[in-house]
């Protein structure tokens, strides 16, 4: 997939990074990778933003790696995403039935329309051809972006327990008994 590349130099890169992160929140799907100034010998960027989903794959663990390989072969472009722990169920003869309140897919990857890399004071925009006319406008918008102020609230947070306190203590006591017997280790 062809991308248009434009490079800009930015004086106040930390401000730009903060503006970029806030600017990205208008999109439903984003990946934000930030080294947090940790220096590595082979790093090709300090920060990367992938956003504005063009194509994606979302699947359960069954044949997840085969589906990902097919998606990657068809896309022939940058893809970003995650592989959940439960994908192991297709690789090994294992199974887990852990509670999943968030209901994430077992595997999700997407092809971004917009990619922005920061290295030092250099900012590179890698946009798909269909949106490359937005590079200059986006750059200016990010530069001028006013960070929203977050209002503090004093409302109490209510946490709903999944198990009762007594049941939790009972499970911990059983686990500690196993540790003391040497059946399992910390």
PLM regions with names:
Residues 1-186:
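Signature of the chorismate-utilizing enzyme
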């Amino acid at each position: 997939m062809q991308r248009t590349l434009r490079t800009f130099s930015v004086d106040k890169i930390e401000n730009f990074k903060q503006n970029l992160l806030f600017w990205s929140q208008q999109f439903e799907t984003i990946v934000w990778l930030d080294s947090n100034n940790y220096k590595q010998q082979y790093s090709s960027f300090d920060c990367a933003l992938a956003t504005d989903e063009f194509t994606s794959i979302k699947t359960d663990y069954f044949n997840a790696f085969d589906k990902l390989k097919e998606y990657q072969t068809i896309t022939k472009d940058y893809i970003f995403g995650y592989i959940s722990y439960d994908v192991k169920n297709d690789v090994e003869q294992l199974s887990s039935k852990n509670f999943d309140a968030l209901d994430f897919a077992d595997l999700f990857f997407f092809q971004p329309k917009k990619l922005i890399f920061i290295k030092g004071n250099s900012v590179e925009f890698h946009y798909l051809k269909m949106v490359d006319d937005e590079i200059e406008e986006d750059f200016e918008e990010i530069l001028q972006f006013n960070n929203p102020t977050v209002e503090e609230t004093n409302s109490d947070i209510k946490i709903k327990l999944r198990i009762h306190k007594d049941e939790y203590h009972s499970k911990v006591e059983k686990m500690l008994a196993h540790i003391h017997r040497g059946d399992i280790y910390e």
